[in-house]
Swiss-Prot record:
Role: Catalyzes the transfer of the enolpyruvyl moiety of phosphoenolpyruvate (PEP) to the 5-hydroxyl of shikimate-3-phosphate (S3P) to produce enolpyruvyl shikimate-3-phosphate and inorganic phosphate.
MF-aspect GO terms: 3-phosphoshikimate 1-carboxyvinyltransferase activity
Assembly and interaction partners: Monomer.
Protein name according to UniProt: 3-phosphoshikimate 1-carboxyvinyltransferase
Keyword Transmembrane set for record: no
């Protein structure tokens, strides 16, 4: 789907769905498979532009990726090779940052770039810790922005104490540590998503976790099988809509419920949503469950501190849901939203205010008073997939009034089937 889109759907939302595979796990399955000693078989890989970027990158480094039935098979090269051209990561910050860590220890010259949005996203936070390991890195605008030039060289292990919890920075350092001499440790102020640690351990890499510290030593993964659960960041749009839209009930099956990613479920519970889990199990090292949310009378809450890394990507649609909650919802410690694909605090604040929301922005968050009836509005998505999908949810809460999204091509970044699934859940949707 490309170009602008006029949303005129009507709720409630009712039904049972599966959302596509988790984007974070999909990236790692391809990349770790390319680093391995044997082939990796992946089931449920997300078919979206961000993951396509990682696939192209690992192929440029010598890996072979092929489809076999419902699985994707990653066959690693004997050793990663210098890419023959600039590696284009598209809109994927995960691809660029994790590859920066890997390529720091791979002999040769690599240049990592991306689209206009990615080239505005910060990379110094990755470059500085990798340099402490001996990496030879440079980037545009005083090492602040991509492209990133990597000259692979021998690395040494280091202890990194991060000021901001970031799974991407942590993962870049741990992956560089696989090529380094000695141990590499990352210490975070709060726990970020731990898919890297889980997958590396599942592929035979010794990983030591001690509270907020993670340590690896030089090793090469052995490959294996990865079964990707549904992405909770994608499910968030339907779960938040169901909680706020009277008469709604939505079940998302086979959903990833890794504890480092379930901040959204905690917030839904704190706001009074009717939420339940069933069929809880663990597959290939990742917890999953069927999650059901029913509409309820929501109330405001305070969101901040250690929970923020566990729901940072879901906060835009949480802001939409908060407009329908009685009382005041306050989000703090979320400054990271300002350096995503867009400044998501500014983008959502502007869009919701124009739709009639009572919202006050802070440097690191916002306060929203509710409940407030929303109205139709024209929205600048700023080429940000989560802004587009969040405001499609806002349209449902606007009593069927039209919301015009100026560009929805960005949704293909993470969730190409979003609008089709939304239509299937809507009664009288279009």
């Amino acid at each position: 789907m490309t170009g602008s889109l006029t949303c005129r759907r009507k709720g409630p939302l009712r039904g049972s769905i599966e959302v596509p595979g988790d984007k974070s796990i999909s990236h790692r399955a391809l990349l770790f498979g390319a680093l391995s000693t044997g082939e990796t078989r992946v089931r449920g890989l997300l078919d979206a532009e961000d993951v396509h970027a990682t696939r192209r990158a690992v192929e440029a480094l010598g890996a072979t990726v092929r489809a076999e039935g419902e699985e994707l098979v990653v066959v690693p090269p004997p050793a990663l090779r210098e890419p023959g051209d600039v590696v284009d990561c598209g809109n994927s910050g995960t691809s660029l940052r994790l590859l920066t860590g890997v390529l720091s220890g791979v002999p040769g010259l690599s240049i990592l770039t991306g689209d206009a949005s990615l080239r505005r996203r910060p990379v110094r936070r990755v470059i500085e810790p990798l340099r402490r390991m001996g990496a030879d890195l440079s980037a545009r605008d005083g090492d602040r922005l991509p492209p990133v030039v990597v000259r692979g060289r021998p690395l040494r292990g280091a202890r990194h104490v991060l000021e901001v919890a970031s799974a991407q920075v942590k993962s870049a350092c741990l992956l560089a540590g696989l090529f380094a001499e000695g141990e590499t440790t990352v210490v975070e102020p709060e726990r970020s998503r731990d898919h890297t640690e889980r997958m590396l351990a599942g592929m035979g890499v010794p990983v030591r976790v001690d509270g907020l510290e993670v340590t690896v030593a030089p090793a090469r993964p052995r490959g294996g099988r990865v079964d990707v659960p549904g992405d909770i960041s994608s499910a968030a749009f339907f779960l938040c809509a169901a909680a706020a839209l009277p008469g709604s009930e939505v079940t998302v099956r086979n959903l990833g419920v890794n504890p480092t990613r379930t901040g959204l479920l905690d917030v839904l519970g704190a706001m009074g949503a009717a939420l339940s889990r069933a069929n809880e199990r663990e597959v290939a090292g990742e917890p999953r469950a069927d999650v059901t949310v029913r509409a309820a009378a929501l109330h405001g809450t305070e969101i901040g501190g250690a929970i923020i890394p566990r729901l940072i990507d879901e906060l835009p649609v949480v802001m939409v849901m908060a407009t329908q909650a009685r009382g005041r919802t306050v989000i703090r410690d979320a400054k990271e939203l300002r350096v995503k694909e867009s400044d998501r605090l500014a983008s959502m604040g502007e869009a919701l205010a124009r739709a009639g929301a009572k919202i006050e922005l802070f440097e690191d968050g916002c306060a929203i008073e509710g409940p407030t009836p929303l109205r139709g509005v024209a929205v600048q998505t700023r080429l940000d997939h989560r802004i587009a999908m969040s405001m499609a949810v806002a349209q449902l809460l606007a009593g069927g009034e039209e919301v015009v999204l100026d560009d929805v091509a960005c949704v293909a970044t993470s969730f190409p089937s979003f609008f089709a699934l939304l239509d299937g859940l809507c009664e009288g949707g279009a």
